[in-house]
């Protein structure tokens, strides 16, 4: 029987949209802590919040976006949120106090969270159900590329041209995403009777999905660990007199993750979740241990490879598990629930770790992150691995 077609025009445009949106996130996430220190003399915790306040906004918006996405319209919401992203990127240049910077970050995060939920949900209706893991993995390569290009430019642009050039780059990527919103065609999701009846019922069951929360809880834990590298690795590398290793970490992360995503999705579809998930947890663990015990140029680059194989592969695999667990009418809510907890980990991670780092040092902080990866693996075993993860999961989507 002929395999369902995956590489359509809209799937490719969706990858471009995802890349542009993710670039905005990673461009600013890795540089805002340093900007807050340089511009406003912020302390470690405040600098961490300058970075993660964006994620706070994203978490807030995801709570409601999953429920109301199909009422608003997926493409319409993408257009609105990307327009806001353009304005917010320009507004950073005019923020003259830390409070204003934080306010813009939160608003920008709200727009990103809503737009990201829209594209992550919509692309699942473009991917054939029989190729769910494979398609989600390929789609995630855009995020992978942005994890290398975004942090790299986030370090290079301020050093070469100062921070306004960084904000201009963010505005440009938002503009690219805005244009792509008019090119992509997304299938319209018909509202179920339950969705219509419960439109104004803001009960917990209508805002979040249990399957999305279960799998998202794992990403909450490991997301905190990845936030350490995202926000504090540049300073950690500089303290160890290998400042240039930080940008190379993200390049190594992206290359390793990109290679892994070319085949882990197909392996997940064919051989089951556990066959893929447990090895990527181990890779992630090794990467964090390397950061803790070998903070040299080769050690940090090698850590980037292992974290790329680990965390970089884990995210699309977990998303595929979440969306396979619900009917089509619940995909938006399940997707928003999944990313809500992933964002929460990225948001609270810099705040918690920023407070802990002065006590433990960078080495101790990354060893703590290794412990979080182990905890995430244990949680996975209890919420999914021991029940359904050992074989290809049954799918509601069709």
Residue ranges and their predicted role:
Residues 55-63, 147-148, 254-258, 262, ...:
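Residue-level signature of mid-helix packing/kink "hotspots" within the transmembrane helices
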Residues 1-7, 186-217, 398:
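Juxtamembrane intracellular "pre-TM" segments in multi-pass secondary transporters
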Residues 41, 73, 94-100, 272, ...:
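Helix-breaking motifs and short loop linkers at transmembrane-helix boundaries and internal kinks
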Residues 60-93:
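Conserved MFS/SLC helix-loop-helix module at the cytosolic interface between two early adjacent transmembrane helices
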Residues 61-73, 261-272, 357:
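Helix-to-loop junctions at the C-terminal end of transmembrane segments
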Residues 99-107, 287, 298-306:
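Paired small-residue
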Residues 172-192, 379-384:
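C-terminal membrane-cytosol helix-exit motif in multi-pass small-molecule transporters
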Residues 106-143:
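Cytoplasmic helix-loop-helix junction between adjacent transmembrane helices
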